[in-house]
Structures are given as structure tokens and as C-alpha cells.
Amino acid sequence: MNVLVQGAVHALGYYEDGKYSREPDCYESIRDLIRYLREDGDDHTARIECGRHNLVEQDLVPMVKCEDLTDDEFDIAIRLMVNLCQPAISTMRGKPPADRDQWKMYWELEENLRRAKTAFSDAHFFTAIKKRIDNYFIDTEYEDRDERLRLVVERIVLLIKYVFSINPDTSEGRRTRIEDSSHDRVIIAFLESGIDKTLMHIANQPREKEFHVTILDIFALILKEQTAEDLATKSEEVSTAEQKKTEEEFRKIIENHVVKETQKRKSFSRFGGSYTIKGLKGISANSSQVVFKPIQNVEKHNFLDDRKAKKRAPRNRRPFEIDTNSHFASSEVRGMLRDMVIRIIETCFNRLMKSSKTTVFVQVQKTSQINYFFLIKFVLRFVRLSRQDHLLERISECIGVEAFHENNVQLTEYVENATTLKGVEAKSHGLKAQYALGAYNELVLLHRYIYEHAKEENERKFAKRALEHIVNVEEYRELPIFIIKKFSSSVLSNNFLRELVLTTHHYMKLVERFVKTGALKKVTKKVKVRKATKKSKMSEEDVRSEFDGMSKKDLDRLWEESKGLVLQILKKEVPEMRGMNPIDSQLDVPVDAQQKFAKLSIQRSLRSRGFPAAVGLYHASRALWPESFKRGLTDFQDSPGEEDQLQELEQLLKADMKKVAKDLKKAESCKTCDEDPAYKKYDKMDATALQSLWEQSTDTLARILSHELPESESTSPVNWQLDITPDVQQKFAMLAIQRALRARDLPAAVGLYHTSRKLWPGDEAIFGAPGIGVEEEIAELKAILEADLHEVAREMKVAEDRAEDPDEEDPAEPYDSEQEEEEEVPAWKVEEIDFQFDSYVCKFSNVDVLKWYVFLLNDFSKNSTELNQALVKMLHRIAFDLKLPIKLYQVSLFQVFSKVNEHFTHLSKDLRKSSRLYELYQFGFHLLKKFFSKFTGDLAIEALFWKGPRECFEIENGYGSWVKSREADIRVWTEDLEIELRNLYEEYRTMETRDGIDVLDFIEHNLSRARSRKKVAKKLIEFGFDLLGAKWKNSDKARMDSVLPIGDIQKWYDEWKEAGARGDLVNVLQEKLNEDLGMEISRKKILKQLAHMDILYEKPKKEKPLPQWDTGLIEELKKLKEQYDDIPDALNMLGVNIVRYVMKRLSEKKPTRQVERHLESLGATIPERSKKSEKNGKKFDDFLNDDDDDSENDVGGGSEDDEEEEIVMKSKRIIPDSEDEEEHIEQEEAQKKLEKVAEKPNTLMGMIAGRKRKLAQLESDSSDESDDDDSAEKEEKKLPAAEDDSDLEEDAVIYKRSYVDALLTGGSIAGNGITETRRDTSEEREDDDDEDPFTKKLTFKRRIVMSDNEDEA
């Protein structure tokens, strides 16, 4: 391959006198190189050879600059350059190197790319490719563009992206910091050619979305080695700042050199050898430590510590850094890049980012996502630092609430993926999360800058709205805490952690400012939705009752304003409201009270200015009670007296009816407690009526009880829809019996009476003991008839009204996934809460947060000043603002303070205050001061570990104080808790439906602090509250039997069992219960009741769906079934059942079970299969397991058994016909040969051959398709292949051929059936109906003779 590549490279052309000359076969040579690269193996020999010759710089770039280059040559040259310049990781198919050889290959590919990059620092090259792009996009109309040229342009744009994606050469020699690197020189050539303007033009075209993502990558890669600060600052300011920075660096270098020189001690001859240190013991306690090297400072001598083996973290778990590769470019490069960034913002930034957004995130382009967030961060930072406010409108696509939301979503997703995935993929998501976090940080800073410094009010309002959004919504407030708790140093870099700390610092400063200015008092928070209990529907009190308290002055004013309108209504100039009913039929009050309530209703209508309704109600009342409305009565019948009626209405308006209003409210409150109107006349029967009714019903009752007349058995004494206790159910059953007796429905009454006795056969015998006589039953029924059950009737009415609500759910019913889907209540809701800044800061005092802050603080000397300030500010908030310094009593933090103190030891006070570490030094001083003021032996031990809330509390108040305070908190009922208890009690009392939950359960589960049921009950009794029937111990277990009708379930279960237990028991019970109760009962509830009744439920197996057949095959099956059914007595005539009949004639072979199932679906009767004999299975195993050893051991002992078996086998044989005699003889000869083979010596190969022979015999005997030629040929091939011995193979082939020939020439079924001698043995076998003459399984040493006249049948 190397020779071919070298030959092709030398055949391209040569560079002479500043001009590149192409060889005649240059085009074909490039094609050959492309083919070599395409056929290159995993060692990438061709690519590496091209890189060694630096083909891009020596040949391809000069070739492209040639003016006489044809289109085809240009196209193929660009193709080869794109292929050679693709990233090394793409060449290795995106997989990182796995071993040393692959790493060596990878670095060689990278080095070749770096050498090739310098070739693109020629502006003429970019000018040449710019002409091609301009010719396509600018000079050619959209409709006239050629698809082939478009492909060339795509390759050019991709080539530019590959060129700028080549990693910089770190070993490149640079004399000064601002000397142009290879990357900078390529940028200069790129910008001088003007191709950047062409790319901006393409990015601004909405039709060219395919190029936008690649152009975005190009701009991001150009700017990746620059910082926004360098480009945003003007050149004069940069020069001054750079001069100062350079002087400062030189000063530091000199100081460090001086310090190092002064720390070196001069060598003295007396310290040239080994010596001991006084006061410092060695390994042995009796000897001093011996030193063999010079010591700079004896106090810092840690000789023993250096010898300890340090614990090393695995390589894949170590914290890592991501190099940004940024450098300070020359003023020329910075100026050109600054102008380019401004042009991007002004011409195409919004369009480019909007069109790229969908492509980048929808199509999941990993590298482009990083470049997308980098460009957002760079541009936003550039606009903020350059203070060019006129550019804010040009970046509107990447700012605002929507930008925050999109960034938040992507950042959360990246962090989740980074912490859940593993390996390179996890680090890839971590890298994307780093750039997304940087963009989020710049969004916060830019909006804050606009809010503080923008000149236009609209821009300030826009920024304020976005900032208020991110501080109000919980997702943004919890984002820093969420990320830092998820942080893992193995997949997220230290760069990410530093960016996160800075972002948190800026966000908290923003929140703190909003709190101090009063702009942030309420925030939104997601809370779990507790399913609200339904409030009672209070008696619908007249809304006009609010006018009952009107003063006399107001009434006089009202009448003066409205009497004219009332008079017009009375004169019928204005229509009154017709059909008014002054009587409330639901109120059980006397007529006098109804008249008063009607007048009150008229008064309220007048006072609420409902004059048409008031006049209509007045006329309706006067028609009902003329004696109570006497004024104007004489005129009413002939001509109405409007003036008299007006006076009476005025009196009603001004009358004092407060007492009547109280009576009305009392009557309405008792309305729901009244008896059921349907049974009202029966419930209020007096003693005389009851005596008369009993005398008339005694004879009929006696006849029913004596079984002379039938009783009703279809009635149930209990309404199972009511959620009540068993005792109350018994009362309701007695009321049902009483109402049936009083309604003269005697059969139903007796049926209810007997059913109730079966349901409650307890010791109390409320409905009589089992086996009592007729006279005793009559006496008990008379007692039930005459009993006073008015209170029971009211309770029943209340319970029935409570059960009428269709939305009410059963609290005892567990969740059933098979029920119909109900409307789901959202599990979370957003509500406003008071925002406490200290509570928010307290969330950062978590150990998982603090350990990473201390981790970054260890590198305080390398950190930027801004990062150190952010770290110290957070620790200061926790230690001093929250007054939790104990949280920071940690040895790892104290070691940082020790290093800082060492740094400040040799500095004067003036230098200390000007130092960038002064804030850290001051914070450490005050924190250690607090620590040593409380220092004890226990505190020294506690400083070794991170501390949670419990540990901090116990350090402050003593060990064990945490538990004691919690216990004291549990025992004490605070005033707020008592108020909450009262409110919950009142809430329970006003509930319309209590879902079977008593007051103690309700309060126990809704109280803000945990209190036991017993303590809640004691507190309610202490307050003098009624427990409303609740017991101190929950009695849900005792109510288990009252959930469903046990008697009916047992009866239905017995019926289902007697019917053969067909179908699903739960489905049967569910249908019965739905019909009986009129409500849906869940499967889980029925299963629970069955378990309680000790009824074993087995879920029926689901019937498998029918196998999928073709429509034509199913139609053929139907015709065969009809054909079989048309034959009279088909089973005896044909000798086969319908299954075998169909299988023989079906055009396509199908399994027997599938044919049976399809026939069953068509209504055919399928004969049952008999179980196979266990003895046959045993013989099968014996046949496989016996070997020559067994036969030898059995010699002499089993001769009688062998003789009997031979007799049996002879009786089983079928005598062959004369025409089959020859085949029969051949079969017997083959059998004898096999028997001779079996008599070979007992060797290992003989045993294996015998075992294989027996397996082959079994396979040939159990074949279901013995009449198929193909299968026979297949079996002929299988048998000899299974044997190793050549003689055995030959014998087996002879035997198999004779056996199959005998089977195939045996004929088919005849009309007279099959003649077969029955077996005389007692072995079990399958029934004759199951034996198929067509595909019958033939056992060894058996033949079946069949006639050939199959068609005649």
C-alpha cells in the first residue's frame, strides 16, 4: 500500500518557480488516492503515508490556487482535502484509542494534521474557494442552481470547518506571548480573503438552513482560542493593560527567584554527612531520628509522613481539567476578530441561532451543541463588556425568558445524563453541561447589566421581567443546589465546578438584591396536592338573607326609589313573574309557619330589588291564603286595588321578620334529617292503625311462615352502598322489615326477616334464633311492626343522601389498575409562598455542597480573584450570616487557612491588605477564633468529619440534646397546634361525606406534627369535644364483613361451582354485584372479600389467540369441514376423525394443535387426546440408556424375559401381503445386519456407535411425515452422518432405505379401513381414534399394510 500511495503522490505534479505544474495523469492519481483511502484498513496506512508526504501543503493547496484548474479537477482536489483533513477521532470512527499502538497511530494522525494546517495560512487559497461559493450563492439565482455545484460548495464549507478544528500545536516555538500562532495566521488569511462575509450572507438566508450549523461551527472554532475580554477591550486599553500585566509577571518571577535563593542554606562541611535531630524520635522510641540530607526548616520536617503510601484514586475517578487552549493574540488579529464579531451580530446572529437551534438539538449533533452554547456565551459576554447597547436588539433570539428556559432544560438534561451514563459518553455530556452552564451564567450577567445600565425603559423592563422570572420560579432557584449535589469529579471537570460556583455567586447576589429592595417577597413553589375532602353542602340558604339587617333609613330610601316601579307592576304595565310557589314542600312545618316564610320571601325579594318576583310571589300567596292577605281582597276578584296592594307591600318591606328568619333557618337545617317521604305515611302510623293492620295480616303471615304460601327470596335486607357499621346495618334491616309489614308486603317482610337471621346469627338473636317455631316468629314480627324506629329512619335518610353523590369514592376500596380510568388529579400544584433569603442560603450548608467549596479552596493560589471571592462569600454567609460556624469546623478547611497564613507570614500589614487573598485570610482568622473559643477534646474529634444538623446541634447543646428536644417537641401541644386541632375538628364536622373516616383518623393524618390517635382523642376530650362515635382503637377489621354482601357472594359462588366453574369467578361476582347493588365494584375489593371468606381463587388461564392463517387456507378448512360433515357416519366410514381427515387434505402443512383450534372456532367437535403411557416413556429412556455392558451383565439372568418379549413382539407384527413380501424380506435382512453390528466387542467406540444407532432408530421411528419423499431423503442423509464406523454407516443406509421403501409402498387408506392385529399385551397405548392412517407413527419392527385405493374412499 505504501508503494502505491507514494507512486500516486509523485504522479500529481511538482512546484517550480512559484507555480504548481500538474502531471498529465494528475486527475487519475487523485482518484487512486481517494480509492486507497476508502480501502484503507484499521492501521490507516494510506492516510499516514499521505500525511508524511504532507500532501495537502505540497500538492493540493497549490493545485487549488491554479487559475487554469478545471471544475472536475477542483472538485476532486477538494474531495481529497476533505478526506485528509477530517479529525483523527473521526478517522478512528469516534472510538478512543484502546492500546499503545492505537495511541501511537492517533498521535501521528494528529501531528500530520497540525503540519497540514499551516498550508491554509495563504489568503490566495481562500480567495480561490470564495470564488466558487460566490458563483453559486450570489451570481446564480436560486432556481438555476445546479445540484452538483451545491455538493462542491458543501465540501468547501466542510473543509473550512475541518481546518479550524485542528488542535493547536503546543510545541510550536513562539518568541513572545503575542506572536501569531499557526491558528492566528489561518484566521488572518481567512479574513483577508473576505470569505467570512460570504458565509455571513449564507447564514442570513432562510433557504440555506443546511449550511447554518456548519457555519456556526466555523465561527465558534475561529473564536475558541480567544476570550471575549480581549476582543471587547479597545486596542489602546489593551496595550496599557498588557504592559502592566507583563511588568507584574516579571516582578513575580524575580520575587520567586529571590525567595528560592534565600531559602537555600549554604552547605557547611559539618553537615556533609549524616546527623541526628535532638528532640525528634525515630522509629525506635529509644533512638533519635537520623537524617541523611540537608534540611531547610527543622520545624517542617516530616520524614515519616513522606514514607507513607498515599491512597491513590483510580484514573477514571480522578478530578480532571479541560484545557481551553486560549491565548492572547496580536493586536492585528484581535482587531480583525473584533470587527468580525460585530459584523456577525449585526448581519446574521439572530437568524443563524434560530435556524441552528432546531437542527442542533433535534438531530442531536454533539459537537455542534458545544459550539452553539460557546457562541452564545462569547457573544453575550462581548456585548456586555464592550458596552455597545445598540447590539442588544441584534441578539434578542438568545436573551429573555425563553432563552433561560431552553438553557435550563438542556443543562438539566446534560447533568442527568453525565451522572447516569458511564465512560466517554458521560464525559461528553459533562463537557456539554460545562458550556451550557457558561451560557447560563452570561445570561444572568447580561440581564443584570441591562437592568442596571440600559438607557431605554423598554430594555430595562424586558430585563427585569426575565430576572423576576428566574428568581420567582422554583426550578431556577433550585438549579445550583441540584447541580452541585449531582456533581461527580469523574465525569464533570474542575472547570465545570468553578463555573458553577461563579454562577451560584452571581445568582445569589441577584436574589439578595431583589430581597433588599423589596421586589422579592413571594415566590412560586411546587407542593404536593392533598386530595381535598368534600365540604358539606349546607342547606341552601337564601342569598337574599343578607338584606335582613337593613336599617330603617335604608328601607325608606329604597321604597321611595322603587314604589313607582312596583305600582307599574301592579298595574300590569310591567310584567310580573308568573308561576311563583310560596310553599317549600321540603319543609315539614305547619301552615301558619309556611305563611310566615312566604311573607319573609316576599320581603327579601323586595329588599333585593327583585320586584317582579316579589309581586308574583305576593299574588300567589294571596291566592293560597286569602285570610292572611286581606288588604285589597274585595278588589282582587273584580278589579285589583293597586293602592291597597302597594301599601301592604310597603308594610311587608319594612316589617321586622328576624325571628321568622331564624325559624326558617332552623327548619332548613332539619330538612335533611327528616324521614324519607316515600315511607312517611308508614313511619307515622298510630297504634290504632297498627292494631288493625296486624289483625288483618296475622293469618297470611302464619301461612307464609308455615310454607303454605311462598316468601320472597330476591330481597336483601341491607343496602350495601351505604358505608355504615354492622350494628347500624341491623337497625336498617329491622326498619326495612317494619316498612314491608306496614306496606302489607308480607312475603317480602318474611323474606327479609329470614335473610337477616342468616346474616346475623349472633348470640343476641335480634331476628330470632335458628329453628324457632312459627308462633315465636309471629310474636317477633309483631314486635318489629310496633317498634318506634323514627330515629333509625332519620339515620337511614342521612346515610342514603350521603351515598347519592356520584363523585364520592369508597375509602376502603384499594387502587385497582383494571378499573376504568378516572380523571386524574394533578400530584403537584404551584402556589405562592413567602420567600426567606436565610432559608434559601441554608440549603447550601449541606455537606454535599460544602465539600466541593473546600475542594476548590485548596487551589486558592491558582484560582482567579473572582472565584476566591465567590468561595469566601458563600462560606461567610453560612458561618456568620446564618450563625452556623460549626458547619465549617473541618480540618481540611483549617489546612487551607494554614497555607494562607504561611503566605501572609512574611508580608507587612500594607501588603496584606492589598493582597488578593486578604478576604480569605480575614475569614479564616475570625472562623478559627470562634473555633478555639469553644475548643474541647470532643470538638477536636468532630473537626475530622463533616457535620449535619444533628451533629451541629449536639456540639452546641451537648450530646443527646437532639433526641431530648425532639421528644419534648412531641410531648408538648403548642398553642398553634391546638388551634390547628380545633380547625381540623370543625372541618370534619362540616364535611358532607366522611368516606368512612372517623374524626380521629382525619385529624391524625392531617395534623402538621405527628400525634398518635390516642393523644388526639385525649386532647379532644380535654377541649370538651364529642368524638362523634370514634373509638380510640380503629375497628376497620371488624367492618370487613360489611363491605360486600357475604350471603349473596357465597350463594353465587356455590352456583358457579355447581355449573362447572366455567369463566372467571371474579367477573361473575362483579356482574352479579353490579346488578344487585347498582354500582361498580372493583376486582381488588372482591378478591379481598373472597380471601376473607376463605374462598380460594385461581385466576383462569388466558386463552391464546388463534394462530394467524391465510384467508384462503381458512376457506379451504371450512370446505373440508363441510365435506366431512356431509359424509354420514364419517368416523366409521372413513376410519379417521375430522382432524386427521383435514390434515391429510390441507394444501399447507400445519401443526395438529393449530388445526384443532381452528376447527373448534368453526364449531367442530374435537375428540379428546388420551395421555401417553408412562411405561412407553420409561421404555424410551431404557432404550437410550442400555449399552453393551448392560447386555453382558444381563446374560444368563434375563433369558426368560427375552423369550417373553420375543413372543410379544411377534404378536405385534402384521403379516405382510404377497406383493410386499420382497420389501419385507429386505427389511428383515437389514435388521439382522444391524443386530450383528450390535454384537461387536465392548469398546468405547462401540458404545458410542451403539448409542448413536439407537438414537437414529428412534428418530426414524418417530417421524410424523413418513410418507414425504423429501423427509425420507433427509432422514437417509442424517442416519449415516451420525455414525463414525464405516460398516455401521453402510448397514444403516441399507436398513433405512428398505424401511422407507416398505413404508412408501404400503399404499393408503381403503374404504374398509385398516386391518391390524390387536396387541395381546397389557401395555397402555393411544386410542384408535387418535391413530392417523396417513401419518401414523411406526414403532420399531412394525409394518403397516395399506391399500392403494385411497381415492376410491
Swiss-Prot record:
Instruction: Provide the GO biological process annotations.
Output: cell division; DNA repair; DNA replication checkpoint signaling; embryo development ending in birth or egg hatching; meiotic cell cycle; meiotic sister chromatid cohesion; mitotic sister chromatid cohesion; regulation of sister chromatid cohesion
The UniProt regions of compositional bias labelled Acidic residues, in chain numbering, are 802-825, 1183-1206, 1217-1226, 1261-1273, 1282-1291, 1323-1332
Protein's job: Plays an important role in chromosome cohesion during both mitosis and meiosis. In prophase of meiosis, it is involved in the formation of the synaptonemal complex (SC) and specifically, in the diplotene and diakinesis phases of prophase, it stabilizes the association of homologous chromosomes during synapsis and sister chromatid cohesion. It regulates cohesin subunits to promote meiotic chromosome cohesion and localizes non-SMC (structural maintenance of chromosome) cohesin subunits to chromatin prior to or during pre-meiotic S phase.
Q: Which Pfam families match?
A: TIMELESS
Q: What is its subcellular localisation?
A: Nucleus
* Region of interest (Disordered), ranges: 798-825, 1150-1291, 1306-1335
Q: What range does the record give for the signal peptide? A: none
**What effect does gene inactivation have here?**
RNAi-mediated knockdown is embryonic lethal. In germline cells, aberrant segregation of chromosomes is observed during both mitosis and meiosis, resulting in aneuploidy. There is a weaker mitosis phenotype in somatic tissues. Weak seam cell differentiation capacity during the L4 larval development stage, including 30% increased seam cell fusion and reduced cell cycle exit. RNAi-mediated knockdown increases the survival rate and partially restores alae formation of let-7 n2853 mutants at 20 dgrees Celsius.
Source organism, top-level taxon = Eukaryota
| Basic and acidic residues bias: start-end ranges | 1150-1160, 1168-1182, 1227-1239
Family annotation (PANTHER family):
PROTEIN TIMELESS HOMOLOG, TIMEOUT/TIMELESS-2
The UniProt entry's sequence similarity note says: Belongs to the timeless family.
Gene Ontology CC terms: nucleus; replication fork protection complex
Q: Which UniProt keywords apply?
A: Cell cycle, Cell division, Developmental protein, Meiosis, Mitosis, Nucleus
* Molecular-function GO terms, alphabetical: DNA binding
Q: How does it assemble?
A: Associates with the cohesin complex. Interacts with smc-1, smc-3, scc-1 and scc-3.
| Name this protein carries in UniProt | Protein timeless homolog
Q: What is its main location?
A: nucleus
UniProt entry tagged with the keyword Repeat: no
